Amino acid sequence: SDFGIHKEKTLTSFGVYTNKDITVSIFADGVKKQFAVKGGVKPAVLKPYMRGTKFKIRFDGRADGVVIAAPKLTLEYYE
């Protein structure tokens, strides 16, 4: 997605809650970064600092009963 902003932007922060361990893959214009996220009662906050126009986020969890919720992205861009 370009999140409705059709210009280059930087993903500075990504927060997500998960009750079990997962892997989060973030793609920016085809460039991939992977993060191991531990499950817990508080949201995990990742600092990907990825620049691009289009982003894709993938969640991989292999445990039974995994819950992934409340993703929060922080983007920076300039007009």
What do these predicted regions represent?
Residues 1-79:
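Beta-sheet repeat architectures centered on beta-propellers
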